[in-house]
């Protein structure tokens, strides 16, 4: 969203060293594996990232989380937001995970995904953060001692001034957070305008679409010829998937009709090294310019069975370790264009590949860009896809988009 709005954007993996200078960019993203980390670790990492960004002269801070508000009763959205509000001394922050282009909307405080209430969208079966309540005021209230209010649709639909006034009233009433309704991109733009003076904004990536214009209006955003331009990198193509979302399962179903697909079976082989070896052996004569797909994705029933045998945390760690090892093996064998499906999977893969920074390019589908990845390993074209994002043909479309770029 920031790149689309004209901001050159670089994403850093993990908290940078204290003495590392910020990259030459209009927006810097510090990516943390904080969604399912222990609360204390998530808070500490987030505060360390904040401190580094403050040292670099950042003007505004954005705590980005999933558009499906992925979290548990313990957090980590509430505890991290609390820590950031306290550290910045701002006393208040809006919370808006809406991303209408990807069918994530908030109405009367209820989050909808794909036209269904969040708890009826498939997210109730998420293997790590099952979402069983669509009322975000309730969900966030369970994660924070701060009071949570609502800026409802009728207010949002009246525009930025009405939104700003409503948030001011909520803060004066002692609310620490405001869930903000949004069902259209126009609403997100208005929310962004209303939050121009806020030190902290929290939400999904969608609400960021309203922010670049604030900086442009303030005269601090330079004109860029093409903020999405990336270096061109040739090499073999591959997809690795760990997400078990309905969207990813549908994308895999489509891919099976067009490219080779290998399915990992951690129920039969609950050993990450063995799963990795089997997948890489299968791929040995298939790596090339045409995509191949290796997936650990499974139905909710299979996920539940694996978790019952191994435990939720161990089952998740097994899949992440296997998929990350497979990605590393594919890169060793010449893959330079890689798509990764799944949020936790993406973090595991980026860590295993030694990725330190991602220059953000143009979008394949809304919310999913190609990036140019660099770090301790080979440079890569890398697309990290949230499990619930992307059209059905995403795994093939991604490489068509790359070929079409000049």
Language model segments and positions:
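Short glycine-rich or small-residue beta-strand-to-loop segments that form or flank ligand, phosphate
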Residues: 28-36, 59-70, 181, 238-239, ...
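Cap/lid and interdomain-hinge subdomains that line or gate substrate/regulatory clefts
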Residues: 10, 26, 42, 50-188, ...
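C-terminal structural cap/anchor segments
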Residues: 283-341
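Conserved, well-structured core segments that form the ligand-binding/active-site neighborhood
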Residues: 114-279
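N-terminal basic/disordered segments at the start of proteins
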Residues: 1-24, 42-45, 98-101
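Short acidic, glycine/serine/threonine-rich loops at helix termini
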Residues: 1, 73-77, 104-112, 162-163, ...
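Conserved, well-ordered active-site substructure
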Residues: 335-336, 344-394
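A structural-propensity feature for long, helix-poor, extended segments
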Residues: 21-34, 287-289, 372-406
